[in-house]
Each structure stands twice: as structure tokens, then as C-alpha cells.
Design a protein with these regions (language model features):
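PLP-dependent amino-acid enzyme catalytic core
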Residues: 1-403
Length: 403
């Protein structure tokens, strides 16, 4: 059972393994939304995510005998690092089962804390089932990533810090995967101030908690599909579910495209790397239809591998019309490429890629295709460049960039 005494105890214990992440006021998001927006940067924890709070507190509640049997868990990455780090602090062996789709950065960092990593299954649920098998077979103590009151209590220490620093907070936005973080945060927030509204945020492609709350019972999704790998969960926690039924005020679901935009917003306006699951609460700000409120978005983690980061940046630039491609047909004669380039240069467009296809027509002397990938300042600038090409006699077609 989650109690105020346990939350207070956990707040003191987790200080040994975590740092108190101070709220960051966001001028950018405040102006965008008409609220006072603060960010809770759990991506700044030593392990890169909030998960170490729940892992450390849970392990602290175990007996020495339970710890010495060895610890095992399943995780898409951040809980893995939390358990590995906490186990090392307690001098215990840790075995971590991770889905085969887990980003390499999370796998390597988990190993770096001294844990044994086993890759199994495509999603968390499959990895978890295998971890439970190993626990039974080898006698390990299983540390559940979210469906455990002690783990949820540790995660809830985030709410203690938020309310201590911002006593008059109106809204707290919290990411939801299996529900451990949302359980701890919403339960403690309501204990300390029932007027605080706690909004859960899920990826639209893995909205297991929303489906469960609507059904009035825990349900399992047939599949999940989201770039927010840390919250790609089919089945929410059965033990924590009643707390969320009682304490969660609403749920917002977020499409992947919104996460891509949020990543660019964080990089460009806060110079901060936040992983896709951590960006859920940033993307949700525009769907929170309130004004003049104090809002805290919990950034749950920042463990993103460079390849994923590169892909998200590219997609974000394309989505915002800062990179686009046009196809034009040109007569196959000298000087045509210079003419097109001059039109673009006069509009301050920056060419970053050219693809010249002489075989678009059976008569290559009649026309060749030129695909031009450009960098622009945004939608208005893109339209200006396209219109300039039209005015100079070209018939530009905007096509999907192939970078």
C-alpha cells in the first residue's frame, strides 16, 4: 500500500543514489501555451532517467538474503540501468532481460553498471515473461519495472520534489508506460494537495492505460507501434491500476509526429536531449486546453542513441518544411542547371542535394528530371521558393525527400 510515511521514507533513501533535479522554467513553452510551464529534467539523473528512484528504493526494502540471491528484471532500457546501478551500490548481482529492439546506448550503459544483459523478445511484455522464467529457474529476486508498490513509491519522490519547489502547481503531466511513475506521482500529489490535476500521457500507438481505464479493468493491447520505446507496453500494471483509477485526472495520447516536433523544440530552445518517451509530456502541452496555469512536464529520460537522434532530427526538419524536395523537368541543354540554381539562390534557398535523371523520358533531349533537396526557414520560405520556380516557367512538384 502507498502511504505518506513510505513516500517520505523513500524521499530520504533515494537521495543516496539520485540528484534532486531542479525545475526549469520554459519561456518558449510558456509563450506557446499561455501557461507557466516548468520542466522536471529527470534526464539529468546519473543513469539518464527517473527509473533509478524506484529501483533503488525497492532494493533498499529487500532483505540481505534476497539481495544476495541476485536480482533480475525486464526493461526497455531505463529501468534496466536503474536496477543495474542500484544493485551495484548494494553489492548485488543483476541480470537484465531487454527486448531485442532496445537502443544500443541503453544496452551498453546497462552493461557498464556491471549487469548481465540478456536480449529477448520484440517488446517489453515478452522480455518480462522470460525474466520471470529465469527468476523461477535460478532463484533470483524479481524487480518489476512498474507493477510494484515499492517501485511506484520510489518514483513518486518526483512529486515530492515538484511540490516542495512549486507548492502552487496546478497541473503535472506524467508519461505512462506500465503506470509505475504515474501511480507514484499522482498518488502523492493528491495526498499533498487534492487540487493538483495529474494528467497521464501515453503514445497513441501504445495506449494501454487509456484502454484499461475506459474498460474499467486492465486490458492487453494486441500490439504496440510507437517510436517511444520506453513506453511501448501492451499491458499496464494490475497492482498499480487501482491507484490510477482513483488519482489520475485524465489521459492524453500523442502521435509519433508530435514527438518528433517536440524533440526539435527541446534541442533548439532548451539545448537538451530528451528521449521519445520523455517527450510525451512536452508534446502534450498543446493539447492541455487551459490558460494561466502552472504546469510541470516530467521529462522522464534522455537515453537516446545517436542513430535514432539523427533520424528524428531529419524527420522533424522535413515535417516543419525546413527540408523539402522538388522535382522539375528541364531541357537537356547547357545552362539549365545554372538557371534553376539562380532562381533558388535569389530566394535564399540552400541546395543540399541534387539528383539528375536523364531517363525520365524516352527522348532525353526533350526533358530530364532534376530532384532538388533544399533547406528552408519554414513553410512560408518553402512556398516562396516553389512559387519563384513557377514564375520562371518551371512546374515544380513537391515530393518526399530521400536523404
Amino acid at each position: 500500500m502507498l502511504t505518506l510515511d513510505k513516500f517520505e521514507e523513500a524521499s530520504e533513501i533515494v537521495k543516496k543514489a539520485t540528484q534532486e533535479t531542479k525545475l526549469i522554467y520554459s519561456k518558449y513553452f510558456s509563450e506557446q501555451t499561455g501557461n507557466k510551464v516548468y520542466l522536471k529534467p529527470e534526464n539529468m539523473q546519473t543513469t539518464g532517467a527517473y527509473k533509478v528512484r524506484g529501483a533503488y528504493y525497492k532494493i533498499s526494502t529487500l532483505s540481505e538474503e534476497e539481495r544476495q540471491k541476485g536480482l533480475i528484471t525486464a526493461s526497455a532500457g531505463n529501468h534496466a540501468q536503474g536496477v543495474a546501478y542500484a544493485a551495484k551500490e548494494f553489492g548485488a548481482k543483476a541480470v537484465i532481460v531487454m527486448p531485442t529492439t532496445t537502443p544500443l546506448i541503453k544496452v551498453n550503459r546497462t552493461k557498464g553498471y556491471g549487469a548481465e544483459v540478456v536480449l529477448y523478445g520484440d517488446v517489453y511484455d515478452e522480455a518480462c515473461a522470460y525474466a520471470l522464467e529465469l527468476a523461477e529457474k535460478e532463484g533470483y529476486t524479481f524487480i518489476h519495472p512498474f507493477d510494484d508498490p515499492a517501485v511506484a513509491t520510489g518514483q513518486g519522490t518526483i512529486a515530492m520534489e515538484i511540490i516542495k519547489e512549486l507548492p502552487l502547481v496546478d497541473y503535472i503531466l506524467v508519461p505512462i508506460g506500465g503506470g509505475g511513475l504515474a501511480t507514484g506521482v499522482s498518488t502523492l500529489a493528491k495526498m499533498l494537495n487534492p487540487n493538483i490535476r495529474v494528467i497521464g500521457v501515453e503514445p497513441a500507438g501504445a495506449a494501454c492505460m487509456k484502454a484499461s481505464l475506459q474498460a474499467g479493468e486492465v486490458v492487453t493491447l494486441p500490439n504496440v507501434n510507437t517510436i517511444a520505446d520506453g513506453t511501448a507496453v501492451k499491458t499496464p500494471g494490475k497492482n498499480v491500476f487501482p491507484y490510477l483509477q482513483k488519482n489520475l485526472d485524465d489521459i492524453i495520447t500523442i502521435e509519433d509526429d508530435d514527438l518528433i516536433v517536440a524533440f526539435l523544440d527541446m534541442v533548439e530552445n532548451h539545448k537538451m536531449i530528451v528521449e521519445n518517451s520523455g517527450l510525451l509530456t512536452v508534446a502534450a502541452l498543446k493539447y492541455l486546453h487551459v490558460k494561466d496555469k502552472k504546469v510541470v512536464s516530467i521529462l522522464s529520460g534522455g537515453n537516446m542513441d545517436v542513430i535514432t537522434m539523427s533520424s528524428v532530427v531529419q524527420l522533424g526538419l522535413i515535417q516543419r518544411d525546413r527540408i523539402f524536395t522538388v522535382s522539375v523537368l528541364l531541357p537537356d541543354k547547357a545552362g539549365e542547371l545554372v538557371r534553376v540554381a539562380t532562381v533558388i539562390a535569389n530566394e535564399q534557398g540552400n541546395v543540399i542535394k541534387l539528383d539528375h535523371n536523364q531517363f525520365v523520358s524516352t527522348n532525353r533531349n526533350a526533358a530530364v528530371e532534376l530532384k532538388i533537396t533544399l533547406e528552408a526557414f519554414g513553410t512560408d520560405h518553402k512556398e516562396r521558393i516553389v512559387n519563384a520556380l513557377k514564375e520562371h516557367g518551371y512546374n515544380p512538384k513537391v515530393i518526399r525527400p530521400n536523404l
